[in-house]
């Protein structure tokens, strides 16, 4: 994630880009949730070129699954980042990625993740079925989720995502 381990940070880069003539819009994608701080959001909300669209990778709405994925945030911390964006931007489009069927994901964990996706009201959710990749820690984990269960979970989240998106489009001010 740009800005976490580098001397230059993302906010400084955005401010510099904002000053460039000919650049009309700035849109951020695939943000690490830890970058979203009150100072960061407050500052970019003042920039006329900033598009109110933010893609924050969630991966899972269940803390136990996030921990197995070695993510460095909790669902609650992620939700707070979304709240900050909504505090400073009028009707921002929040999009995300969710992985279903990560090793060890139980029905209860999936239900927790699904409820979280429902709660956040994403504009769009990209759903991916976990695929085993040799040489990774996850490939060696016990409790690999069967493909048919991943397919069912994926279909459930896709249906939820489409329903939520339709509601947001229907109720959003023009």
Locate each region found by the language model.
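Conserved SAM/AdoMet-binding glycine-rich loop
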Residues: 1-107
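Radical SAM enzyme [4Fe-4S]-AdoMet core and its adjacent flexible, acidic
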Residues: 3-18, 22, 68-72, 132-164
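Short, hinge-like loop/turn segments at secondary-structure boundaries
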Residues: 44-46, 113, 142-145
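Catalytic cores of alpha/beta
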Residues: 104-117
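Contiguous mid-protein beta-loop-alpha structural module that forms a pocket-lining wall or clamp
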Residues: 121
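Internal alpha/beta loop-helix hairpins
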Residues: 124-131
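Conserved small/polar residues in nucleotide/adenosyl-binding loops
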Residues: 170-174
């Amino acid at each position: 994630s740009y800005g976490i381990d580098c001397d230059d940070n993302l906010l400084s880069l955005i401010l510099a880009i904002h000053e460039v003539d000919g650049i009309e819009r700035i849109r951020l994608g695939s943000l690490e949730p830890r970058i979203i701080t009150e100072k960061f959001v407050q500052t970019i909300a003042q920039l006329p070129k900033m598009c109110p669209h933010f893609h924050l990778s969630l991966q899972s709405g269940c803390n136990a699954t996030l921990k197995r994925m070695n993510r460095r945030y909790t669902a609650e911390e992620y939700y707070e980042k979304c709240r900050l964006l909504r505090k400073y931007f009028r009707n921002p489009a929040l999009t995300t990625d969710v992985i279903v069927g990560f090793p060890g994901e139980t029905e209860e964990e999936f239900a927790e993740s699904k409820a979280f996706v429902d709660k956040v009201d994403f504009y769009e959710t990209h759903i991916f079925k976990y695929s085993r990749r040799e040489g990774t820690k996850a490939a060696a984990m016990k409790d690999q989720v069967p493909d048919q269960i991943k397919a069912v979970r994926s279909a459930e989240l896709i249906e939820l995502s489409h329903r939520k998106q339709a509601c947001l489009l229907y109720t959003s001010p023009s």
